[in-house]
């Protein structure tokens, strides 16, 4: 597969997962309304070819299903993402190999890292057209406004690239930007993010911070930029590790930064420390409008793009959204890393409906009383991204944590609310979460939905009903003989069981 956005669009079209829309659409509200309906139904990616006010087409919902995200990462099944997670786990906490086989596996990972180093493109497609000076007008890019209460037009899937003015180490993040004028935008990032750290360092040295925004990149690179990695590692290296070969980079025209050579658009500008403008409100992943915050102002002096570029975008909100699908894929990648940190956890799942981080379901191979509570506490402290997880449900390894019917059964049949529910008060809390009494401070809940063993219970636990293994195998062998071979039992319609989805 080609390592650019166009190659991915072509792949989706070949596999029947892209629809081209030739009717004129408005980037103000209409594009998002159409796309949201497709997202709710798990529909195909969309390419709007006739966008009001812009000569450029808009691509959206390309990563609207887990299947398509797997394709973006050159995979066919979500389980393959765990193999990638195993590589990252080795790199994060390498251990001396105890066996020859372990040494060979680690050697393979190191070889993959060597292959993943970025390359250079001295005649990049992203600079086929250069616009600067008085000709620069960001309104030419078909930026969308997703919700009626949004403050303005936004960029959502741009790679925001900055560099540490001391070490030269780049940071690549996916941050929201709001259009302020034809040459300026505000960037919304948390104080702990790499771009914010770089801006503070530039301020300490009395320098402007150079910024590049790469739009319309290979979705695989977006996934790499969204992966929490150690501060001193490069997202370009991670993207190469994800894709199996290095990312081709190009030097910007007016700033000392590098961007993916096959980007559809590149914006080049600077931030003067202390120069801020109000940013927001905008609809966010919590399903509400966020607040208004003073955010750094980026002044752009140059725009480059490919010939006939395609603008890639998305928007936040209540799941399902593309960000939720990305989170499900990252969930699989984190799994081996989490197992390395907390060995008793056999699997974990962050349900999309819980915003992909507010609630976690973890399974354990239970061996002693109190283990479920220990596993929940260990989960909260294992990785920084679990800091704001409000609910942790612990189940036995026999429970399919990705089947809500099994999880609800485990809670209903194995939990005594007095004994098995524990609350941690006054813990760090997501500032975007309105549920807490105090901003930034709230509680957490753990639920032990495992089978209880003495001394957790004083009575004998019931025996779980199971089919006879021999008969189950016999029925599977004779299924077609019964005349039922045309019935697919692997795809379940929840609406047949009382749900309204």
Curated annotation (Swiss-Prot):
Gene Ontology cellular component annotations, sorted alphabetically: cytoplasm; cytosol
Any Pfam family hit:
UbiD_N
**Top-rank taxon:** Bacteria
Q: What is this protein called?
A: Uncharacterized protein sll0936
Q: Which PANTHER family match?
A: 3-OCTAPRENYL-4-HYDROXYBENZOATE CARBOXY-LYASE-RELATED, FERULIC ACID DECARBOXYLASE 1
Which family is it part of? Answer: Belongs to the UbiD family.
Q: Which GO terms describe its biological process?
A: ubiquinone biosynthetic process
What species was this sequence derived from?
Answer: Synechocystis sp. (strain ATCC 27184 / PCC 6803 / Kazusa)
Which InterPro entries does this entry report, sorted A to Z? UbiD (IPR002830), UbiD-like_C (IPR049381), UbiD-like_N (IPR049383), UbiD_Rift_dom (IPR048304)
Single GO molecular function: 3-octaprenyl-4-hydroxybenzoate carboxy-lyase activity
